[in-house]
Amino acid sequence: MMRTLITTHPLLLLLLLQQLLQPVQLQEVDTDFDSPDDEMEELEEYLEEFQSRGPTRPPTKENVERRVIIEPGMPLYDRDYCNEEIKRKNVYHKYRCVTEHYFLLMQYDELQKICYNRFVPCKNGVRKCNRSKGLVEGVYCNLTEALEIPGCEYKSFYRTGYVLITCAWQNEIHKLIPHTINDLVEPPKHRSFLNEDGVFVIPP
């Protein structure tokens, strides 16, 4: 019986063993697959990234779309938006909660084009980011409780602002692709200007 299980369902057995041996349980996975092969490949990729002790893997289009781009469904003003979506999209770093995260209501192609916009200072003032030319709707998630999963709790903030992102060169496709969302900067309610560094300056 055991030999049959090992030879016919090695991946299933591996997943069961991982569940038993890991001190932290993985997020529940939806088993209502539209495309079993694609979903299983995504699960294997997630497990590899989740349990890796090495450096974070370089970003991919699929990874950015899954973790950042908003899908139709829950209202952006919902106070539990971040708690629900971060769990559903498995937005974690190794076994730890991310301290902040952004979900954006835009197409991936639009986000990628921002990589070729002018540089502006990131919100930490150290690195350089690319800024969107227009306003984008999104949700900012800020960690309020716990540091390790599954106890992550977030406060959700709906925003409409300019997206600041960092990008990385991907050799396989010879293009810049989004790497991280640095900020979603809301413009002042009254008249303002952008100086040459892309920073908002309030006129006297």
Curated annotation (Swiss-Prot):
UniProt record, GO biological process: defense response to Gram-positive bacterium
Covalent S-S links between cysteines: 97-152, 115-167, 122-129
GO CC field: extracellular region
Signal peptide positions (record): 1-26
Source superkingdom: Eukaryota
Carbohydrate attachment residues: 130, 142
Subcellular location: Secreted
Any GO MF annotation of the entry: nucleic acid binding
Entry keyword set: Disulfide bond, Glycoprotein, Secreted, Signal
Functional note: Does not exhibit any ribonuclease activity.
Family of the protein in this entry: Belongs to the pancreatic ribonuclease family.
Protein name, as recorded: Inactive ribonuclease-like protein 9
